[in-house]
């Protein structure tokens, strides 16, 4: 009732999402200790939890932090698939190359304040984005 899914259905859906993301082929149950998972598998579980309710906006704060190249690519592939499903992803990161590759729009913050916004078609390289960031933040 009231939109809640039964526990078995929740576990089934969580496992489907985790496998879809590609972080693990292990089946996870309600009693599975997260501590037994690798960093990438934990990240997969966290992302699966974030998309579980089919939210229109998914916030990923440093989702590739401490991941291998293979796991990072899985995050990128997943984000691209989410974007194709008409959901938005707020991708927060410090790696300018990751941010540039995955984003359509950029919002530059300085001390929590929005100081500049631009679309990907306004720039051609991550280095150009970095220069705009330096110039914008340096002006404040």
Segments (PLM) and residue ranges:
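Glycine-rich phosphate-binding loops of nucleotide-dependent enzymes
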Residues: 1-140
């Amino acid at each position: 009732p009231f939109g809640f899914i039964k526990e078995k259905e929740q576990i089934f859906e969580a496992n489907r999402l985790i496998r879809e993301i590609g972080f693990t082929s292990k089946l996870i149950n309600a009693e599975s200790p997260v501590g037994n998972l690798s960093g990438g598998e934990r990240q997969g579980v966290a992302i699966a939890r974030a998309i579980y309710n089919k939210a229109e906006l998914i916030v990923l704060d440093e989702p590739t932090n401490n991941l291998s190249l293979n796991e990072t690519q899985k995050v990128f592939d997943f984000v691209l698939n989410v974007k194709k499903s008409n959901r938005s992803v707020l991708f927060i990161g410090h790696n300018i190359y990751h941010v540039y590759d995955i984003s359509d729009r950029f919002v530059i913050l300085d001390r929590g304040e929005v100081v500049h916004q631009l679309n990907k078609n306004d720039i051609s390289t991550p280095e150009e984005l970095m220069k705009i960031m330096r110039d914008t933040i340096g002006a404040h």
